[in-house]
Amino acid sequence: MTHTIAAPTSSNSAQAAQYEALLTAFYQAFAQGDGEAMAACYAPDARFSDPVFTDLYGQAVGDMWRMLTSRAQDFKLEFSGIRADEHTGEAHWIATYTFSQTGRTVVNRIHSRFVFADGKIAQQQDMFDFWRWTQQALGLTGYLLGWSNMVQGKIRAQAAKGLQQYQRQQGR
């Protein structure tokens, strides 16, 4: 079950600065394709959700980033708007890459919200326009059917299967 994470409030505390630095390090690692460094930013029992990976927990969160960064083609990341308070954070980012299954270029604009605990990311909720993503990744099929539960469900199932295969290959 996905819970909406509130936006951070204004804060000048040392804890808020630490969490802003954590998010900056997270996105710098992402831009460099370093899934291992990204995974290290999460608490062991972290939760992640987005329109594709709707509810990941613990090791699966880090494994998702390891998988995605290891398979990325023509990947470019821009990030901005990093803000944090003592408990929550947010960032905006744009991922540009080639979707391997179709060879089509995707420019995905994402807004992320975070909850922190003990110096790590405890929860992350990424929001983006799934239909827009399907249009870019799948072309005409995405434009005509990408809004439907059927197509979105197939994409989610395929992503979950890919993550499970990756985890098996890694011995997890």
Predicted regions and their residues:
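Soluble or luminal CAZymes and related metallo-dependent hydrolases
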Residues: Q18, A60, V106
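A beta-strand edge to alpha-helix "cap/lid" segment located at domain peripheries
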Residues: T2-A7, T69-E78, R83-R172
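Alpha-helix initiation/capping motif
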Residues: N12-Q15, T54, G103
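Short, mixed-charge, low-aromatic patches
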Residues: Q15-A25, S49-P51, L68-R71, I155-A159
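A solvent-exposed, acidic/Ser-Thr-rich amphipathic alpha-helical stretch
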Residues: G35-A39, A43-G89
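Short, low-complexity N-terminal intrinsically disordered segments enriched in polar/charged residues
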Residues: M1-A40, P44, A160-R172
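Hydrophobic alpha-helical core bundles mediating ligand binding, dimerization, or RNAP-core interactions
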Residues: L23-F26, F30, Y42, V61, ...
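Hydrophobic pocket/interface hotspot
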Residues: F26, M38-A39, A46, V61, ...
